[in-house]
Amino acid sequence: MNTHLFLLINAQEHASKLFILFAVFCANYLILLPIGLLGIYCIYKPVYRTLVIKILISLALVLTVTFIIRHLFYSPRPFVLNVGTNFLTHDKTSSLPSQHAVFIWTICFSIYLNYKKQFKSFAYLSTVVALLVCWSRIYLGVHWPLDILVGMLLSFISVYLIKKFWFLYYKIYK
């Protein structure tokens, strides 16, 4: 199923060069948009710095788990197994879970679970960005769909745990 879904999403050899460039932009640079917007917003609205702290703590947790998974269980990338077409230069590191998916979905879930009403338009924008980043990683041949889904799941769990245990921060530091 993972391979079948990958082949449905993955770009073919004759794919439009313009579409490939768009996907490369999404895969490598679009992830910076929510980070930049969040940074700018927090400079002008210091009251939301707590969101950035929650995101950073969630990222620390989920990236640690991701590091452990990637070093304990090697999952070859599609191009390593000669499946589909690869349009993005990448090391032959383990692909599970996708660090790009982990990073971008941690931002999205942090907003949705903590500040959806205050950041409604930003929540929607970051979701569109997350979907484009994740799609592009599969489209360009560097990730399996399962890599993306596991990254999303780990991000959600991380953000949920930080939200649940946030009160401990106030007990210790306030």
Please report, for each region that a protein language model flagged, where it lies by residue.
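N-terminal transmembrane-helix/juxtamembrane module of multi-pass inner/ER membrane proteins
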Residues: 1-32, 66-93
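Membrane-embedded catalytic cores of phosphoryl/pyrophosphoryl-handling enzymes
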Residues: 88-174
